[in-house]
Amino acid sequence: SRTLLLERGRWWEEETDPGVRGIDQSLANASQLGKGLGTKLVRALVELLFNDPEVTKIQTDPSPSNLRAIRCYEKAGFERQGTVTTPDGPAVYMVQTRQAFERTRSDA
């Protein structure tokens, strides 16, 4: 079973930029873990979202204990911004800006 969530607009109450999108993904089949599928999925989703010229930033918030997800997002170009408190508990706030995305594409 796979879950992919996209949110349009504000992810955090402090976020006022209408071009921000939030993502979350889950690969629930344990036999699929560790094969790079999550990273491929996130990279493809980031590229799809940045195809929209209005998208300025993509953000996500994995649990600090979910080291596999944090590494997946880092490999896909997200950077840690710090730890935030959410209704679900603490989370690692991670972002990828359009500028960073375009910079990595031009380096490739």
Swiss-Prot record:
Signal peptide annotation? none
Q: Which GO terms describe its biological process?
A: response to antibiotic
Species classification: Bacteria, Pseudomonadati, Pseudomonadota, Alphaproteobacteria, Hyphomicrobiales
Name recorded for this polypeptide: Kanamycin resistance protein
Short name of one Pfam family: Acetyltransf_8
Identify the residues that the record assigns to the N-acetyltransferase domain, covering every copy.
Answer: 1-99
Keywords, in A-Z order? Antibiotic resistance, Plasmid
Gene Ontology molecular function, alphabetical: N-acyltransferase activity
The record's section on InterPro entries has:
Acyl_CoA_acyltransferase (IPR016181), GNAT_dom (IPR000182)
Query: Which PROSITE patterns does its entry note?
Result: GNAT (PS51186)
Q: Which domain of life is it from?
A: Bacteria
